[in-house]
Amino acid sequence: MVLAILTPLITGIVTVSILVVGYHINMILGCVIETIMCYQILAVKSLQSRKYEVYYALDKEGLQQARNAVAMIVGRDTKQLDEHGVVRAAVETVAENTSDGVIAPLFYMMLFGAAGGFVYKAVNTMDSMIGYKNDKYLYFGRFAAKLDDVVNFIPARIGGCLMVVSAGIAQLAEKCNTKDKTNSHYSIGNAWKIFKSDRKKHSSPNAAQTESACAGALKVALSGDNYYFGKLVHKPQIGEAIRPLEAGDIGRSNILLYITAFLMVIIVLLIRLIIMLAVR
């Protein structure tokens, strides 16, 4: 509990101190420092890079390399995963991290600037490090996990709704760029349907928000049983397998991530603009 509180607190103090010094020296310098900080907080580029490595391994290097690549981005055991399991793991990670890697940082940067983004990332990192539900970390990491649930509660729901909208944009774009106007890999209708029905099918109150929207958008089934630290963990299926998962869905989930991130950036900029105009 102490670690989960002290880490975000120290992170916030250090970040604010750097910004105060920067803005005190020069307003432009302060803006540059805060802009660099905000860029570093967002995980879009690193997420895309990792998922491309998984896709490339599946396409060019074989299943074992794909397992190794996906092991770098998931907490589950990957040694026994087949191709479907590797793709599912990658897509699920994109879906979940759309919320805690992109939407939530933007949300807290909108409210509190770069300091808010860094404090949020510290909370999220503590959950990733010690928030596991196993015998070793169950009690030690419980507070970190609960704190992460609290700070992600609103952003996760914003992310889920925006991903549904993103499904519609992706569906329209795909139809405009293909000869087949009747079939699409995306479906805004199914995204909304699965988001409403499956967004609570997870032990975490937040994890299935964007995952359900992504599963519905791609018309595939996600989640289900996985092995963690050698033990089988049963999880409910999220989504309906209207079509089977394929390697291309890794890229499609990334497209949903980028559109969702873009929509959130627009919302953040509009809100901050309204606030600036209101306080003048």
Residue spans of the language-model regions?
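Active-site His/Glu-centered metal-binding helix of metallohydrolases
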Residues: A122, M126, I130
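Hydrophobic alpha-helical transmembrane segments
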Residues: M1-F118, G131-R280
